[in-house]
C-alpha cells in the first residue's frame, strides 16, 4: 500500500459551514522521490523505497550517498519503504506528490511521539501516589511495593515502574482529511498526530474503515 512522507508543521483550526471549529494538524508533503524498486524475484517482496527533502553530503555517510548516486536521485533526508503490488508501474526517480491523496477521506499516520525523558510512575503510568500526611515521609510520589517476598523472589516482567517515557513509534488510524491545499502542498488532518513540530510522518490511505461518519 503506497503512502507518502510528510513533515508536521503544527496545529491550527478551520471552520465548518455551520461555523463550528475543527482542530487540525497541518502536514507539509514535499515531493517524494523513488530511490529504489524492490522486486519479488531479487528481494523476496515488492516495494518502493522513497525519500523526501534534501540533505547535505557532509551530513550523511558514504554508503547512503553511494546508494543515492547509484540510482541517480538527489540525496534526501531519509529512506522509507512502502509495500506495493508486484504489477504496479513505478520507476526510479519518479516523483510522488500530494495529488496521491485526492479523493482520499481517511488516512493512517505513523510518527515518533514526543520524548518525555525519565519519568516517575505517577506521570508514566498514572499512579495516584501515597498519602499526603498520616506518617508519610518523603514517599508521596514513590511507587510503593514492587513485588512479594522470597516467593517468587523476583520482580515480574512488565511491572510498571519509572523509566523512559515517550519517543515511541505510534500509529493513529482513521483520521479524517479535512482539506488538501495543492498549491502549498499542505494536508489538513482532523485532530492531533504523533510527534513534535518538524518531525517526519508516514501517511497512508486507510484499508479498514471503522466509521462512515463525515465532517
Swiss-Prot record:
Annotated region described as Disordered, given as residue ranges: 132-151
GO MF annotation list: rRNA binding; structural constituent of ribosome
Cellular component, GO annotation: cytosolic large ribosomal subunit
UniProt-listed InterPro entries: Ribosomal_uL3 (IPR000597), Ribosomal_uL3_bac/org-type (IPR019927), Ribosomal_uL3_CS (IPR019926), Transl_B-barrel_sf (IPR009000)
PTM characteristics: Methylated by PrmB.
Keywords: Methylation, Ribonucleoprotein, Ribosomal protein, RNA-binding, rRNA-binding
Top-level lineage group: Bacteria
List of residues that carry N5-methylglutamine: 150
Pfam families per UniProt: Ribosomal_L3
GO biological process, one term: translation
Function: One of the primary rRNA binding proteins, it binds directly near the 3'-end of the 23S rRNA, where it nucleates assembly of the 50S subunit.
HAMAP family: Ribosomal_uL3_B (MF_01325_B)
The protein's assembly and partners: Part of the 50S ribosomal subunit. Forms a cluster with proteins L14 and L19.
NCBIfam families: L3_bact
Protein name, UniProt field: Large ribosomal subunit protein uL3
Higher taxonomy: Bacteria, Pseudomonadati, Pseudomonadota, Gammaproteobacteria, Enterobacterales
Amino acid at each position: 500500500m503506497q503512502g507518502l512522507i510528510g513533515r508536521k508543521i503544527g496545529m491550527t483550526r478551520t471552520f465548518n459551514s455551520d461555523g463550528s471549529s475543527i482542530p487540525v494538524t497541518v502536514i507539509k508533503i514535499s515531493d517524494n522521490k523513488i530511490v529504489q524498486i524492490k522486486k519479488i524475484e531479487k528481494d523476496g517482496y515488492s516495494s518502493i523505497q522513497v525519500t523526501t527533502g534534501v540533505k547535505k553530503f557532509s551530513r550523511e555517510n558514504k554508503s547512503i550517498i553511494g546508494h543515492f548516486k547509484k540510482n541517480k536521485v538527489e540525496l534526501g533526508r531519509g529512506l522509507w519503504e512502502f509495500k506495493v503490488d508486484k504489477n504496479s508501474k513505478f520507476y526510479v526517480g519518479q516523483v510522488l506528490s500530494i495529488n496521491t491523496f485526492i479523493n482520499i477521506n481517511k488516512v493512517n499516520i505513523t510518527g515518533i511521539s514526543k520524548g518525555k525523558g525519565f519519568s516517575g510512575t505517577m506521570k508514566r503510568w498514572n499512579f495516584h501516589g501515597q498519602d499526603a500526611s498520616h506518617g508519610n515521609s518523603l514517599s508521596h510520589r514513590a511507587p510503593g511495593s514492587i513485588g512479594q517476598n522470597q516467593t517468587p523472589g523476583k520482580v515480574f516482567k512488565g511491572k510498571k515502574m519509572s523509566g523512559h517515557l515517550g519517543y515511541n513509534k505510534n500509529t493513529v488510524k482513521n483520521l479524517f482529511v479535512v482539506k488538501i491545499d495543492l498549491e502549498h502542498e499542505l494536508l489538513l488532518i482532523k485532530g492531533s498526530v504523533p510527534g513534535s513540530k518538524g518531525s517526519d510522518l508516514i501517511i497512508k490511505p486507510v484499508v479498514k474503515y471503522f466509521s462512515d461518519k463525515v465532517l
